[in-house]
Protein backbone atom coordinates (compact mmCIF):
# COMPACT_ATOMS: atom_id res chain seq x y z
CA UNK A 1 0.00 0.00 0.00
CA UNK A 2 1.51 3.36 -1.01
CA UNK A 3 2.16 5.67 1.90
CA UNK A 4 3.49 8.91 0.44
CA UNK A 5 2.54 11.17 -2.47
CA UNK A 6 5.29 9.98 -4.82
CA UNK A 7 4.29 6.35 -4.34
CA UNK A 8 0.63 7.19 -5.00
CA UNK A 9 1.58 9.08 -8.16
CA UNK A 10 3.67 6.11 -9.31
CA UNK A 11 0.72 3.75 -8.78
CA UNK A 12 -1.51 6.10 -10.82
CA UNK A 13 1.08 6.22 -13.63
CA UNK A 14 1.50 2.43 -13.64
CA UNK A 15 -2.24 1.72 -13.67
CA UNK A 16 -3.46 4.66 -15.74
CA UNK A 17 -6.66 3.23 -17.21
CA UNK A 18 -7.66 1.72 -13.88
CA UNK A 19 -6.96 5.06 -12.18
CA UNK A 20 -9.17 6.87 -14.71
CA UNK A 21 -11.90 4.26 -14.09
CA UNK A 22 -11.60 4.89 -10.36
CA UNK A 23 -11.98 8.66 -10.87
CA UNK A 24 -14.93 8.08 -13.24
CA UNK A 25 -16.69 6.05 -10.55
CA UNK A 26 -16.13 8.71 -7.92
CA UNK A 27 -17.23 11.49 -10.28
CA UNK A 28 -20.41 9.49 -10.98
CA UNK A 29 -21.18 9.11 -7.29
CA UNK A 30 -20.52 12.31 -5.40
CA UNK A 31 -16.89 12.84 -4.61
CA UNK A 32 -15.76 16.41 -5.08
CA UNK A 33 -12.63 15.70 -3.03
CA UNK A 34 -11.47 12.82 -5.26
CA UNK A 35 -11.73 15.00 -8.37
CA UNK A 36 -9.81 17.81 -6.65
CA UNK A 37 -7.08 15.32 -5.73
CA UNK A 38 -7.02 13.99 -9.29
CA UNK A 39 -6.56 17.55 -10.57
CA UNK A 40 -3.69 17.93 -8.12
CA UNK A 41 -2.18 14.69 -9.50
CA UNK A 42 -2.65 15.96 -13.08
CA UNK A 43 -0.39 18.92 -12.35
CA UNK A 44 2.22 16.48 -11.07
CA UNK A 45 2.00 14.46 -14.30
CA UNK A 46 0.07 11.41 -13.09
CA UNK A 47 -3.03 12.23 -15.18
CA UNK A 48 -3.55 14.05 -18.46
CA UNK A 49 -5.59 17.18 -17.66
CA UNK A 50 -7.82 16.99 -20.76
CA UNK A 51 -8.51 13.28 -20.42
CA UNK A 52 -9.20 13.73 -16.71
CA UNK A 53 -11.72 16.50 -17.41
CA UNK A 54 -13.50 14.30 -19.97
CA UNK A 55 -13.60 11.32 -17.60
CA UNK A 56 -15.01 13.49 -14.80
CA UNK A 57 -17.49 15.18 -17.16
CA UNK A 58 -18.85 11.90 -18.48
CA UNK A 59 -18.84 10.30 -15.02
CA UNK A 60 -20.70 13.19 -13.43
CA UNK A 61 -23.23 13.34 -16.27
CA UNK A 62 -23.79 9.57 -16.21
CA UNK A 63 -24.17 9.38 -12.44
CA UNK A 64 -26.84 12.07 -12.35
CA UNK A 65 -28.56 10.63 -15.43
CA UNK A 66 -28.86 7.24 -13.71
CA UNK A 67 -30.21 8.84 -10.52
CA UNK A 68 -32.65 10.90 -12.64
CA UNK A 69 -33.86 7.74 -14.41
CA UNK A 70 -34.34 5.89 -11.10
CA UNK A 71 -36.29 8.84 -9.71
CA UNK A 72 -38.40 9.10 -12.85
CA UNK A 73 -39.03 5.34 -13.02
CA UNK A 74 -39.61 4.52 -9.36
CA UNK A 75 -40.41 7.86 -7.73
CA UNK A 76 -39.78 7.97 -4.01
CA UNK A 77 -41.79 4.85 -3.12
CA UNK A 78 -38.70 2.68 -3.04
CA UNK A 79 -37.44 4.83 -0.16
CA UNK A 80 -40.45 4.11 2.05
CA UNK A 81 -38.31 2.02 4.39
CA UNK A 82 -36.00 5.05 4.84
CA UNK A 83 -38.38 7.82 5.98
CA UNK A 84 -35.65 10.34 6.80
CA UNK A 85 -34.09 10.02 3.35
CA UNK A 86 -37.54 10.14 1.76
CA UNK A 87 -38.27 13.43 3.58
CA UNK A 88 -34.93 14.88 2.49
CA UNK A 89 -35.67 13.82 -1.09
CA UNK A 90 -39.04 15.57 -1.04
CA UNK A 91 -37.44 18.72 0.38
CA UNK A 92 -34.84 18.61 -2.39
CA UNK A 93 -37.59 18.00 -4.96
CA UNK A 94 -39.38 21.17 -3.80
CA UNK A 95 -36.17 23.12 -4.38
CA UNK A 96 -35.90 21.57 -7.82
CA UNK A 97 -39.48 22.54 -8.71
CA UNK A 98 -38.90 26.18 -7.81
CA UNK A 99 -35.29 26.63 -8.91
CA UNK A 100 -34.55 23.79 -11.34
CA UNK A 101 -32.20 25.69 -13.66
CA UNK A 102 -30.05 27.16 -10.89
CA UNK A 103 -30.24 24.03 -8.80
CA UNK A 104 -28.92 21.80 -11.57
CA UNK A 105 -25.82 24.00 -11.81
CA UNK A 106 -25.24 24.25 -8.06
CA UNK A 107 -26.21 20.84 -6.65
CA UNK A 108 -22.81 19.26 -7.35
CA UNK A 109 -20.93 21.47 -4.90
CA UNK A 110 -22.55 21.30 -1.41
CA UNK A 111 -21.86 18.10 0.46
CA UNK A 112 -24.85 15.79 0.78
CA UNK A 113 -27.15 17.39 -1.77
CA UNK A 114 -25.73 15.76 -4.89
CA UNK A 115 -26.64 12.26 -3.74
CA UNK A 116 -30.34 13.13 -3.65
CA UNK A 117 -30.56 15.78 -6.35
CA UNK A 118 -30.56 13.39 -9.31
CA UNK A 119 -33.46 11.47 -7.78
CA UNK A 120 -35.23 14.76 -7.02
CA UNK A 121 -34.88 15.88 -10.63
CA UNK A 122 -36.39 12.54 -11.62
CA UNK A 123 -39.50 12.93 -9.46
CA UNK A 124 -39.93 16.57 -10.49
CA UNK A 125 -41.92 17.83 -13.46
CA UNK A 126 -38.73 18.73 -15.35
CA UNK A 127 -38.72 17.20 -18.83
CA UNK A 128 -36.20 14.52 -19.77
CA UNK A 129 -34.73 16.70 -22.53
CA UNK A 130 -34.32 19.74 -20.27
CA UNK A 131 -32.64 17.65 -17.61
CA UNK A 132 -30.25 15.96 -20.03
CA UNK A 133 -29.21 19.22 -21.71
CA UNK A 134 -28.75 21.16 -18.47
CA UNK A 135 -27.08 18.19 -16.77
CA UNK A 136 -24.60 17.85 -19.66
CA UNK A 137 -23.65 21.53 -19.49
CA UNK A 138 -23.54 21.53 -15.68
CA UNK A 139 -21.39 18.38 -15.54
CA UNK A 140 -18.93 19.97 -17.97
CA UNK A 141 -18.66 23.16 -15.95
CA UNK A 142 -18.24 21.14 -12.75
CA UNK A 143 -15.54 18.92 -14.28
CA UNK A 144 -13.51 21.82 -15.67
CA UNK A 145 -13.74 23.94 -12.52
CA UNK A 146 -13.08 21.12 -10.05
CA UNK A 147 -10.19 19.50 -11.93
CA UNK A 148 -8.72 22.96 -12.58
CA UNK A 149 -9.03 23.94 -8.92
CA UNK A 150 -7.03 20.86 -7.90
CA UNK A 151 -4.54 21.49 -10.70
CA UNK A 152 -3.94 25.12 -9.73
CA UNK A 153 -3.79 24.30 -6.03
CA UNK A 154 -0.96 21.90 -6.86
CA UNK A 155 0.71 24.65 -8.86
CA UNK A 156 0.46 27.02 -5.90
CA UNK A 157 1.78 24.46 -3.45
CA UNK A 158 5.01 23.87 -5.41
Q: What is each PLM-predicted segment?
A:
Residues 1-21, 44-132, 151-158:
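Membrane-interfacial helix-loop-helix
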Residues 17-36, 107:
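Transmembrane alpha-helix interface/packing and boundary motifs in multi-pass membrane proteins
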Residues 26, 59, 137-142:
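Transmembrane alpha-helical core residues of multi-pass small-molecule transporters
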Residues 137, 145, 149-156:
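Membrane-helix interface motif
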Amino acid sequence: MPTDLNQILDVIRQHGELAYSFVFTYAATNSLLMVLLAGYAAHLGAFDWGKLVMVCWIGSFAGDAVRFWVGRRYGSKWLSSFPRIQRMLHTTARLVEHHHTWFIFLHRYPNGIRSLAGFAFGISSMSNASFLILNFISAGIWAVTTVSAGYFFSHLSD
